[in-house]
């Protein structure tokens, strides 16, 4: 069995935008052109649903995104709570406003992972507050990218 190291590099250009939708802020992350790595990009301060959607659309244009990935904060048992319902409403509004796929992933514990990542990177606790939303978006997007890559590789024929 051989490994095709050029597999990812031969695909069409790819740009995913990841969102961590909270009550006050929306963390924004983006993927590299190969769909391998997610990086936190910034934060949208929430104002109103139409303004929030317009800000996301601006990020989509800026990044030339081909897909938007939104984290849904499911409860520990996988059920939908009040915060998840709020995010689902946001997702429906976004889907109506953009002409590209908007997919959701379970973001359970993404903030915990983001805090750990920032600590491991040596970011002081005071500085973490400003970065946590975009890092959570990066965790959400990275989860989706990894799942996408693994599902594609499991479908690839063995050589």
Swiss-Prot record:
It holds the Pfam family RuvX. GO terms for cellular component: cytosol. Gene3D superfamilies: YqgF/RNase H-like domain. SMART domains: YqgFc. Its EC number is 3.1.-.-. InterPro entries: RNaseH-like_sf (IPR012337), YqgF (IPR005227), YqgF/RNaseH-like_dom (IPR006641), YqgF/RNaseH-like_dom_sf (IPR037027). GO terms for biological process: rRNA 5'-end processing. It is found in: Cytoplasm. It comes from the Bacteria. One of its GO terms (molecular function) is nuclease activity. Keywords: Cytoplasm, Hydrolase, Nuclease, Ribosome biogenesis. Could be a nuclease involved in processing of the 5'-end of pre-16S rRNA. Belongs to the YqgF nuclease family. NCBIfam families: RNAse_H_YqgF. This is Putative pre-16S rRNA nuclease. It comes from Synechococcus sp. (strain JA-3-3Ab) (Cyanobacteria bacterium Yellowstone A-Prime).
């Amino acid at each position: 069995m051989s490994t095709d190291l050029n597999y990812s590099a031969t695909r069409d250009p790819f740009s995913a935008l990841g969102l961590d939708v909270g009550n006050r802020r929306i963390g924004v992350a983006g993927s590299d052109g190969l769909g391998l790595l997610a990086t936190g990009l910034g934060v949208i301060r929430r104002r109103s649903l139409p303004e929030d959607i317009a800000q996301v659309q601006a990020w989509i244009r800026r990044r030339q995104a081909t897909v938007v990935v939104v984290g849904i904060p499911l409860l520990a048992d996988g059920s939908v709570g009040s915060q998840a319902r709020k995010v689902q409403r946001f997702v429906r509004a976004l889907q109506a406003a953009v002409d590209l796929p908007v997919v959701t992933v379970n973001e359970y514990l993404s903030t915990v992972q983001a805090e750990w990542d920032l600590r491991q990177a040596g970011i002081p606790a005071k500085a973490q507050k400003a970065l946590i939303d975009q890092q959570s978006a990066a965790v959400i997007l990275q989860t989706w990218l990894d799942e996408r890559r693994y599902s594609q590789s499991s479908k690839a024929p063995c050589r």
